[in-house]
Curated annotation (Swiss-Prot):
Localization of this protein: Cell outer membrane
Membrane topology: Lipid-anchor
Bias-annotated ranges (Polar residues): 282-297
Keywords: Cell adhesion, Cell outer membrane, Lipoprotein, Membrane, Palmitate, Signal, Virulence
PROSITE patterns: PROKAR_LIPOPROTEIN
Lipidation (N-palmitoyl cysteine): 15
Renumbered residue ranges of the record's region Disordered: 282-313
Protein name from the UniProt record: Adhesin MafA 2
Family, as annotated: Belongs to the MafA family.
Superkingdom assignment: Bacteria
The organism's taxonomic lineage, starting at the top: Bacteria, Pseudomonadati, Pseudomonadota, Betaproteobacteria, Neisseriales
Gene Ontology biological process terms, A to Z: cell adhesion
Amino acid sequence: MKTLLLLIPLVLTACGTLTGIPAHGGGKRFAVEQELVAASSRAAVKEMDLSALKGRKAALYVSVMGDQGSGNISGGRYSIDALIRGGYHNNPESATQYSYPAYDTTATTKADALSSVTTSTSLLNAPAAALTRNSGRKGERSAGLSVNGTGDYRNETLLANPRDVSFLTNLIQTVFYLRGIEVVPPEYADTDVFVTVDVFGTVRSRTELHLYNAETLKAQTKLEYFAVDRDSRKLLIAPETAAYESQYQEQYALWMGPYSVGKTVKASDRLMVDFSDITPYGDTTAQNRPDFKQNNGKKPDVGNEVIRRRKGG
């Protein structure tokens, strides 16, 4: 019974379902990747606080970080690979008998009263027949076990999907409309809204702990936005960040499964560097100097460097 329980995991190792979850931009998207990219971008756009723009006509400017590149992910999943060879090899004795044809030659010589007869026997140099006999037993025994993964995974990432920017821009416009904010051409706007999308892509990872294995695909959307009154140059919305990530994960045991499939959407880490602590220089004479007396009551935090300069340190 113990032997049977040990053999079952070895036989079933690497038996499972392979789901296509490539890197961002690798040809036609799988449904899983589409779902994750859409979920993270929708969540990030939905988090945008646009209350300060109520009743305004906004011109929208969206800038997205480029994601063109090329890469290659190759190599199958890790799995046990064992081989047992053995053990017994025997060749029987072999004997071959050849049969060569023979022929007789007789020569008679006469000279007057003398005569002689010569008789000789000759063999051909090629056998007319051959007979081989084997004696004894011949046997060969071997045993082998080889367990491989579910296959080689290869992904090509070359070109970005040109529709991504259009999709994200349409999502932002949809949220503006649902919030009651009118998006108009720049010549009819009283407010300029700038949205910078720093992160908009996917990250694929694989966890291999021999007994526990996992395939994970994450989609992240991180953006920063601010709004300016076109006439007064007041900063209606200080630079704010919205960041979300969605995740799809398959969990395996000895690459059997997946026994668990999960999807999550959550807030992710903010931008490593944002512009929320930037304020105008005190001696600026620019006509379009932004006014940080904001209508939404959200005054940006002043950085340590700015405080040091104000104190003359």
